[in-house]
Amino acid sequence: NNIAAALTASANPTFEVTIAGGRIRQEGRDVLGQQVEQFFSAYKVDFGLFGVGGVDADGSLLDFTEDEIRARETISQNCRTKVVVLDHTKFGRAAYVRGGHISDPDLVFCDGEPPEEIGAMIRDAGHELVTAGDDSAALALLPEFAEAGE
Protein backbone atom coordinates (compact mmCIF):
# COMPACT_ATOMS: atom_id res chain seq x y z
CA ASN A 1 0.00 0.00 0.00
CA ASN A 2 3.03 2.27 -0.46
CA ILE A 3 3.40 4.19 -3.70
CA ALA A 4 7.21 4.44 -3.49
CA ALA A 5 7.52 0.66 -2.99
CA ALA A 6 5.17 0.01 -5.91
CA LEU A 7 7.20 2.30 -8.19
CA THR A 8 10.45 0.61 -7.16
CA ALA A 9 9.02 -2.86 -7.77
CA SER A 10 7.61 -1.78 -11.15
CA ALA A 11 11.15 -1.02 -12.36
CA ASN A 12 11.76 -4.79 -12.52
CA PRO A 13 10.44 -5.93 -15.91
CA THR A 14 9.54 -9.37 -14.53
CA PHE A 15 7.22 -7.95 -11.86
CA GLU A 16 3.59 -7.06 -12.42
CA VAL A 17 2.51 -4.48 -9.86
CA THR A 18 -1.10 -3.71 -8.95
CA ILE A 19 -1.86 -0.95 -6.46
CA ALA A 20 -4.90 -0.18 -4.34
CA GLY A 21 -6.95 2.97 -4.59
CA GLY A 22 -7.69 5.09 -1.57
CA ARG A 23 -6.47 8.11 0.35
CA ILE A 24 -2.74 8.93 0.19
CA ARG A 25 -1.04 9.73 3.49
CA GLN A 26 1.41 12.44 2.46
CA GLU A 27 4.17 11.73 4.98
CA GLY A 28 4.84 8.14 3.94
CA ARG A 29 3.00 8.02 0.61
CA ASP A 30 0.90 5.14 1.92
CA VAL A 31 -2.50 4.46 0.40
CA LEU A 32 -5.06 3.99 3.18
CA GLY A 33 -8.78 3.55 3.70
CA GLN A 34 -11.55 1.04 3.27
CA GLN A 35 -10.74 0.56 -0.44
CA VAL A 36 -7.27 -0.68 0.55
CA GLU A 37 -8.72 -3.26 2.93
CA GLN A 38 -11.17 -4.47 0.27
CA PHE A 39 -8.39 -4.58 -2.32
CA PHE A 40 -6.02 -6.72 -0.23
CA SER A 41 -8.86 -8.98 0.92
CA ALA A 42 -9.39 -10.02 -2.72
CA TYR A 43 -5.86 -11.47 -3.06
CA LYS A 44 -3.77 -14.28 -1.57
CA VAL A 45 -0.11 -13.41 -2.20
CA ASP A 46 3.21 -15.05 -1.39
CA PHE A 47 4.71 -12.02 0.36
CA GLY A 48 3.08 -9.20 2.27
CA LEU A 49 5.56 -6.37 2.87
CA PHE A 50 4.84 -3.59 5.31
CA GLY A 51 6.50 -1.03 7.53
CA VAL A 52 5.64 0.26 10.96
CA GLY A 53 5.69 3.64 12.69
CA GLY A 54 7.51 2.26 15.70
CA VAL A 55 8.35 -0.79 17.81
CA ASP A 56 7.81 -0.53 21.55
CA ALA A 57 10.21 -2.12 24.06
CA ASP A 58 7.60 -4.84 24.70
CA GLY A 59 7.62 -5.73 20.98
CA SER A 60 4.32 -4.04 20.11
CA LEU A 61 4.14 -2.82 16.52
CA LEU A 62 2.94 0.78 16.54
CA ASP A 63 1.56 3.23 14.00
CA PHE A 64 0.00 6.67 13.96
CA THR A 65 -3.49 5.90 12.68
CA GLU A 66 -5.99 3.08 12.90
CA ASP A 67 -6.13 3.05 9.08
CA GLU A 68 -2.45 2.05 8.96
CA ILE A 69 -3.07 -0.77 11.43
CA ARG A 70 -6.11 -2.04 9.51
CA ALA A 71 -4.16 -2.01 6.23
CA ARG A 72 -1.29 -3.95 7.82
CA GLU A 73 -3.66 -6.48 9.42
CA THR A 74 -5.48 -7.04 6.12
CA ILE A 75 -2.20 -7.55 4.26
CA SER A 76 -1.01 -9.97 6.97
CA GLN A 77 -4.20 -12.03 6.79
CA ASN A 78 -3.92 -12.42 3.03
CA CYS A 79 -0.29 -13.43 2.49
CA ARG A 80 1.70 -16.59 3.02
CA THR A 81 4.83 -14.84 4.32
CA LYS A 82 4.66 -11.64 6.39
CA VAL A 83 7.65 -9.33 5.96
CA VAL A 84 8.25 -6.17 7.98
CA VAL A 85 10.88 -3.72 6.75
CA LEU A 86 12.15 -1.07 9.15
CA ASP A 87 15.15 0.97 10.17
CA HIS A 88 16.79 1.35 13.57
CA THR A 89 14.97 4.63 14.32
CA LYS A 90 11.70 2.70 14.76
CA PHE A 91 12.89 0.97 17.95
CA GLY A 92 11.53 2.90 20.92
CA ARG A 93 9.81 5.43 18.65
CA ALA A 94 6.56 6.66 20.15
CA ALA A 95 3.45 6.07 18.06
CA TYR A 96 -0.09 5.89 19.30
CA VAL A 97 -1.90 2.91 17.83
CA ARG A 98 -0.89 -0.67 18.60
CA GLY A 99 -1.38 -3.43 16.04
CA GLY A 100 0.58 -6.65 16.21
CA HIS A 101 3.86 -7.76 17.72
CA ILE A 102 7.44 -7.93 16.39
CA SER A 103 7.25 -11.73 16.67
CA ASP A 104 4.29 -11.87 14.21
CA PRO A 105 6.14 -11.32 10.89
CA ASP A 106 7.93 -14.30 9.36
CA LEU A 107 10.81 -12.06 8.24
CA VAL A 108 12.14 -8.82 9.70
CA PHE A 109 14.48 -6.72 7.55
CA CYS A 110 16.37 -3.92 9.32
CA ASP A 111 19.28 -1.60 8.54
CA GLY A 112 21.09 -2.78 11.68
CA GLU A 113 20.78 -4.98 14.73
CA PRO A 114 17.69 -4.29 16.84
CA PRO A 115 17.90 -3.99 20.63
CA GLU A 116 18.86 -7.35 22.13
CA GLU A 117 15.42 -7.97 23.66
CA ILE A 118 13.66 -7.33 20.34
CA GLY A 119 16.04 -9.62 18.45
CA ALA A 120 15.36 -12.35 21.03
CA MET A 121 11.59 -11.97 20.55
CA ILE A 122 11.99 -12.51 16.80
CA ARG A 123 14.30 -15.51 17.16
CA ASP A 124 12.25 -17.06 20.00
CA ALA A 125 9.23 -17.03 17.67
CA GLY A 126 11.29 -19.03 15.17
CA HIS A 127 11.34 -16.18 12.66
CA GLU A 128 14.17 -14.67 10.64
CA LEU A 129 15.96 -11.36 11.23
CA VAL A 130 17.96 -10.04 8.28
CA THR A 131 20.13 -6.96 8.75
CA ALA A 132 21.70 -4.66 6.16
CA GLY A 133 24.83 -6.08 4.62
CA ASP A 134 23.54 -9.64 4.96
CA ASP A 135 22.63 -9.99 1.27
CA SER A 136 23.34 -13.72 1.10
CA ALA A 137 20.87 -14.39 3.90
CA ALA A 138 18.22 -12.20 2.28
CA LEU A 139 18.58 -13.93 -1.07
CA ALA A 140 18.50 -17.38 0.54
CA LEU A 141 15.29 -16.47 2.35
CA LEU A 142 13.63 -15.01 -0.73
CA PRO A 143 14.74 -17.13 -3.70
CA GLU A 144 11.90 -15.84 -5.87
CA PHE A 145 13.29 -12.31 -5.56
CA ALA A 146 16.82 -13.50 -6.27
CA GLU A 147 15.69 -15.24 -9.48
CA ALA A 148 13.67 -12.21 -10.59
CA GLY A 149 16.70 -9.94 -10.20
CA GLU A 150 18.97 -12.07 -12.42
What are these regions (language model features)?
Residues 1:
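Active-site-adjacent alpha/beta core region of enzyme catalytic domains
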